[in-house]
A protein has these predicted regions:
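Glycine-centered flexible beta-alpha turn that most often forms the glycine-rich phosphate-binding loop
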Residues: 4, 65, 99
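Acidic (Asp/Glu)-rich catalytic clusters
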Residues: 19-31, 55-63, 89-91, 112-117, ...
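A short, structured active-site edge motif that brings together acidic residues
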Residues: 28-41, 70-71
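N-terminal binding-site loop/beta-alpha segment at the start of enzyme catalytic domains
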Residues: 1-30
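Hydrophobic beta-strand scaffold residues
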Residues: 3, 32, 148-150
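Glycine/small-residue-rich loop that forms an oxyanion/phosphate-binding "nest" at active or ligand-binding sites
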Residues: 43-56
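Beta/alpha (TIM)-barrel catalytic core signal, keyed to glycine-rich beta->alpha loops juxtaposed to Asp/Glu
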Residues: 9-12, 72-254
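Active-site groove signature of glycoside hydrolases
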Residues: 58-77
């Protein structure tokens, strides 16, 4: 593990100061990414507020962030273009080394990407917990904005105790001959669903962190992963058809 990912608003807007206080000697050794876009009064992509947040982040951390990500711009899609231009300018001015976009659900951004500069990074949800429509939208979004790197996040949607991890045989997604826990298999699939070069995960346990790191070394079964995507799309299509039929029936009897 060589990276740390945080955000301006994490830990009650105190995450940067907390990191600087508990690990001042270690921070320079990590590739540090943070996010801006949330403020005490809510989500805002105003360029001046974003600049102030980035400047405050560097001051609180005692160093400039390696990467600054625009935090969930789907909450304010109309502000995406000027916000991206502002972060790109901040990178060029030395307030960070790279900039990018992190989005939990890129579907609202489909028609908001026309005028934005190409980001260095896009971070998206990956893995078995992501709905098929969100996976397709994430791939479409990265195709449109053409980042240099694509990172993943939230492979367990914040809950490793979800019944999914005990009721589904996640070993089916791995190449044959590998032994793994469900969590490790979840990590492996998150690196390939869709393909990402880095994966951000949250943990408060060293044992859990070691388990997650082991999962990153596993190889997935390409045929199974492809079949899974096909099934996701078929399921979505059936769901849309059923919804349409119910709506048509309701309209005809209204």
């Amino acid at each position: 593990m060589t990276g740390l990912d945080t955000a301006f608003n994490y830990n009650g807007f105190a995450s940067h100061r907390t990191l600087a206080r508990i690990a001042p000697d270690l921070l320079p050794d990590f590739d540090l990414s943070t996010k801006v876009g949330y403020f005490p009064d809510g989500h805002d992509l105003d360029p001046q507020r974003l600049r102030e947040a980035v400047e405050q982040s560097a001051e609180d951390l005692g160093r400039i962030p390696d990467t600054v990500l625009l935090h969930n711009p789907e909450c304010s899609p109309g502000g995406l273009s000027p916000a991206c231009a502002a972060l790109s300018q901040m990178r060029d001015q030395g307030l960070c080394r790279a900039w990018g976009i992190t989005t939990w659900d890129p579907r609202p951004l489909r028609h908001a990407t026309r005028d934005i500069p190409c980001p260095d990074v896009v971070m998206i949800r990956t893995g078995l917990t992501v709905p098929g429509s969100a996976l397709d939208a994430a791939e479409e979004f990265t195709e449109r904005v053409k980042p240099l790197h694509r990172w993943g996040m939230a492979p367990f949607a914040g809950n490793t105790t979800d019944p999914l991890w005990t009721t589904v045989d996640t070993a089916l997604f791995l190449a044959p001959g590998q032994q793994a826990t469900a969590v490790q298999a979840g990590i492996a699939t998150a690196f390939t669903l869709p393909a990402v070069s880095q994966l951000a995960v949250g943990t408060s346990s060293l044992d859990h962190l070691a388990e997650l790191a082991s999962g990153a070394r596993l190889e997935t079964n390409a045929k199974t992963m492809t079949r899974y995507r096909v099934l996701l799309r078929q399921t979505a299509t059936v769901g849309e058809r059923d919804t349409g039929e119910r709506n048509s029936s309701a309209a005809s009897h209204g």
